[in-house]
């Protein structure tokens, strides 16, 4: 029995040999993701060429850097970072230039940060490793109290939960890679940090101007994107639930609830949905995943997601082929369970015109599973069947 759930594997330019890609494909990989934040167009082209040498059936997705807040580089003497301690006051300031940070002032790449962030806001650095709170605002700087100590390292990510940030949706680097993707006939663009439909429309305009049919997958990575999911779904081809940054923006215990909500919305809208981040994270360093990770993959498949994604597991992990094979085995097992024990599907999730049509659809799905048919062919005049 072949699996229906697709597996996306992130490939790095540091490890993209034809034989390596072939081994992932034979293990069950269906699509390759290229993270443009870590490659050049030249090195990305090598990945694409090698993927196509393996099989034209492998879809290719490029992941844009997107609009994100980051720290700047460090001044001389602070190249390895700036140590901070709990209770210490730190001054932070936005800049349009790449001004180096020091122990006097920490700079961020968003010049509007002073006006956008109110007193009392929490600032998270490096995916939440460091937490600060804004206690005062003075001289165009945010005065922040350190909640947990550590080292502020250069160019780390910055999240400010609950605070809408007005950054350009498409960066200069994104423009470069989107146009490159058009030239290379890439299949999908996964656009990062989508907050509202205008972010999707900005990418659509670039594609339309060049008469490109590349599909857009919107990455939901913040609470604003979750709040605006309905308008985003109106414009996007599909959704990626990117649980890494999302888990920093919202409380960890809300992640399963939010994932279920987003999957349900996608099914209702008949839009593909991908679950990403730390699905088999243990396999970056270990040959076997935890039981919790297996259950995470299984639950995503039970929720009827279209694809599950591997990031560091295949990009730089020690057991990339084993990770893909493990995910494929889980997918087959869950799908086989549905064949033997009945589909875990609620047809009411899908917007169907009336109850008669809904009952016919339910019966057709269950009959096809019980009889193990390969396809359902529908003859329709109205298009609503």
Predicted regions and their residues:
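Non-catalytic helical/linker scaffolds that mediate oligomerization, partner binding
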Residues: 1-385
């Amino acid at each position: 029995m072949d699996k229906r759930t697709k597996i996306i594997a992130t490939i790095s330019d540091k490890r993209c040999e034809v034989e390596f890609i072939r081994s992932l494909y034979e293990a069950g990989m269906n699509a390759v993701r290229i993270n443009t934040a870590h490659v050049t167009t030249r090195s990305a082209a090598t990945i694409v060429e090698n993927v196509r040498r393996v099989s034209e059936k492998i879809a290719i997705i490029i992941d844009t850097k997107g609009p994100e807040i980051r720290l700047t580089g460090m001044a001389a003497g602070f190249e390895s970072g700036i140590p901070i301690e709990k209770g210490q006051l730190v001054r932070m300031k936005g800049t349009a230039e790449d001004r180096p940070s020091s122990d006097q002032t920490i700079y961020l790449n968003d010049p509007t940060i002073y006006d956008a962030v109110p007193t009392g806001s929490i600032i998270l650095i490096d995916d939440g490793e460091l937490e600060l709170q804004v206690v005062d605002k003075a001289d165009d700087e945010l005065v922040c109290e350190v909640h947990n100590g550590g080292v502020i390292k250069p160019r780390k990510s910055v999240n400010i939960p609950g605070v809408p940030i007005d950054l350009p949706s498409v960066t200069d680097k994104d423009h470069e890679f989107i146009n490159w993707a058009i030239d290379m006939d890439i299949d999908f663009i996964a656009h990062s940090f989508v907050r509202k439909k205008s972010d999707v429309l900005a990418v659509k305009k670039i594609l339309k101007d060049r008469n490109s049919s590349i599909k857009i997958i919107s990455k939901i990575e913040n609470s604003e994107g979750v709040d605006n999911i309905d308008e985003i779904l109106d414009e996007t081809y599909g959704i990626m639930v990117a649980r890494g940054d999302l888990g920093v923006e919202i409380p960890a215990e809300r992640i399963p609830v939010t994932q279920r909500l987003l999957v349900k919305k996608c099914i209702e809208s008949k839009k593909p949905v991908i679950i990403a981040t730390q699905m088999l994270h243990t396999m970056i360093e270990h040959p076997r995943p935890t039981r919790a990770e297996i259950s995470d993959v299984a639950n995503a498949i039970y929720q009827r997601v279209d694809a599950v994604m591997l990031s560091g597991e295949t990009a730089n992990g020690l057991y990339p082929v084993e990770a893909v094979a493990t995910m494929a085995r889980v997918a087959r097992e869950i799908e086989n369970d549905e064949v033997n024990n009945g589909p875990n599907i609620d047809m009411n999730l899908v917007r169907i015109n009336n109850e008669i049509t809904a009952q016919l659809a339910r019966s057709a799905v269950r009959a096809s599973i019980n009889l193990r048919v390969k396809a359902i062919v529908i003859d329709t005049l109205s298009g609503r069947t």
